[in-house]
C-alpha cells in the first residue's frame, strides 16, 4: 500500500470540500521541502478570479500506516533543514495523514508553521541539517468552512509575520524586563480571518 499517495488523496478530498481553496499537491513533486501549495481566495465559489487570490500557502504532506486513528494530536519529527526552509519563505502548513491497514479510513493532522513558531523551534538548531525537531500536530477539521478558516487564518498571520523573519522576536518576558521608553511607539495588533458563516 502506498501510504504517501493515499495520504495525498485523503487530503485532496478534504480540501476539495471548500469553496475558498484550490490545491496543487503532487506526490511526485521535486521541491526540496514541499509537496505543493494551496491557493486561498477571498470569495467562495467553484471558479475564482485572479483578483481574489489572497496567497499561495506552501504545504508538506506525509502519509503513514497507523492502526490508531482516534488521537486528537500527534507528534512528528521534522528536519531542522526543512524548518529553516519554511521560515525563509514565510511559513508552511505541515500535514501528516494516518491511514488504517486496509486503506479505507484516515485521520488528518496538521501544524500551521508560521515565522514566530518556526523561530522558537529553531532555537535549538546547532547547524546539523540532518537533526530533527519533534512538532505537535492537531486534528484537521472536517467541516468545509472550518477547513477554509485554517487557511484564511494562516494567510492573515503569514502576511503579518513576514517582517519578523529576519528580526529578533519580542517576548512577554523581554517586554517586562526592558525600559518602557523603548516601546513607546510600538502598536500591538491581533487579527483572525474566517469565512462567512452564511454558507454551509
Predicted features and spans:
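A general secondary-structure signal for short beta-strands and their flanking turns/coil
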Residues: 31-33, 54, 90, 183-185, ...
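A generic structural signal for short, solvent-exposed coil/turn residues
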Residues: 28, 51-53, 87, 102, ...
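Elongated alpha-helical scaffolds
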Residues: 54-120
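Charge-rich interaction segments
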Residues: 136-200
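Short, charged low-complexity intrinsically disordered segments located at boundaries
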Residues: 38-46, 125-126, 182-188
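Short flexible/disordered coil segments
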Residues: 89-99, 124-130, 165-181
Amino acid at each position: 500500500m502506498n501510504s504517501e499517495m493515499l495520504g495525498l488523496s485523503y487530503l485532496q478530498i478534504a480540501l476539495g470540500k471548500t469553496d475558498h481553496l484550490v490545491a496543487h499537491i503532487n506526490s511526485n513533486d521535486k521541491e526540496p521541502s514541499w509537496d505543493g501549495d494551496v491557493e486561498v481566495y477571498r470569495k467562495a465559489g467553484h471558479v475564482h478570479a485572479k483578483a481574489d487570490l489572497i496567497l499561495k500557502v506552501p504545504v508538506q504532506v506525509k502519509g503513514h500506516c497507523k492502526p490508531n486513528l482516534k488521537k486528537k494530536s500527534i507528534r512528528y519529527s521534522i528536519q531542522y533543514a526543512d524548518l529553516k526552509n519554511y521560515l525563509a519563505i514565510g511559513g508552511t502548513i505541515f500535514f501528516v495523514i494516518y491511514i488504517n491497514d486496509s486503506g479505507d479510513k484516515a485521520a488528518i493532522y496538521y501544524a500551521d508553521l508560521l515565522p514566530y513558531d518556526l523561530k522558537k523551534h529553531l532555537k535549538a538548531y546547532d547547524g546539523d541539517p540532518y537533526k530533527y525537531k519533534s512538532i505537535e500536530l492537531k486534528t484537521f477539521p472536517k467541516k468545509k468552512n472550518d477547513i477554509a478558516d485554517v487557511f484564511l487564518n494562516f494567510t492573515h498571520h503569514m502576511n503579518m509575520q513576514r517582517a519578523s523573519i529576519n528580526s529578533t522576536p519580542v517576548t512577554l518576558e523581554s517586554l517586562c524586563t526592558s525600559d518602557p521608553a523603548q516601546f513607546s511607539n510600538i502598536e500591538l495588533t491581533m487579527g483572525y480571518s474566517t469565512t462567512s458563516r452564511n454558507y454551509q
